[in-house]
């Protein structure tokens, strides 16, 4: 026997038993962004490597360690996309979507990072994101946060997630703070872990995000970014908090919250949970007003967020919120004998037309009554329709209930659609 080929480590199959939960999550995401008037954009999985070096930042873990990069036959350096924002900006610039225009966009699809696989963190993962271009005021920051809060409400997990907020100021304010932070870190350099020492000069704000307990202790006395904000940045953050208070969205200001990507400015945020251990962040984003120009477009304000679907699915499973997932099949149609096969297929087809919401499966491959009923039960259907010689002669269909103790009953062929509509409403 030939050796089986396995999936690549960290790249997982989503099996038929798992896909209904994924479909539920995806449906909630689509309906929620639609309610806010956002439009979908789809971009290629493969992009020029320079796109991510210029957007994410060369001195980041993603670019340095995690990207799937290869050279094609033309000698061009290409990369499987590790996140969705850069591709969305590239597409907006390329197709003239962003010049003097407002755009509210969303995307969903697979991303790739060569990380150590663990629960909630994979090498291929599915990301959902929202991006807004052309609006620089705090009210749009509030809107994307209201939209994210609506997602948790629709998924039934509002009580299990918490919003954390911070502001990174504008580039000049951040540069002044950066110098002050470097000066502080230099005084404690010998006590910093290797990762923080490496980042101290290249990306010092990322040291604030260190998970090392000793580094966190040192940072207790570090200068605060809030002290370096100008009036405009302070007012922007104050207005955002005022709007969130007005609509009842609770949050915690976390002065150490930074983002792992270089392009963020002003507002940054994360939704976190205590239910997933170390993988506590379930959605993250912020404002990135300089990225469009950085990638060759005009100066354009922008704000957005992204979330990993694997982590949301894991959270729903962990919280036991998977019971209301509908079965893959509602009605299973059987044919008891060769003469009844054509009638059974016609019944199934008519039901699909008359009741589009109904999931109807026809038995194929023949077999006796026992085999067909075993398949019907395994399908997850709530009822089986039995069509035998007797039913065929009398213009009837036998309805057998598979998930309760109701007695089976005979229904006239021409009344079957109305009967099932009432039964399944």
From Swiss-Prot:
It is found in: Cytoplasm. InterPro entries: aa-tRNA-synth_II, aa-tRNA-synth_II/BPL/LPL, Anticodon-bd, Anticodon-bd_dom_sf, His-tRNA-ligase, HisRS-like_core, HisRS/HisZ, HisRS_anticodon. Keywords: Aminoacyl-tRNA synthetase, ATP-binding, Cytoplasm, Ligase, Nucleotide-binding, Protein biosynthesis. It comes from the Bacteria. GO terms for biological process: histidyl-tRNA aminoacylation. One of its GO terms (cellular component) is cytoplasm. This is Histidine--tRNA ligase.
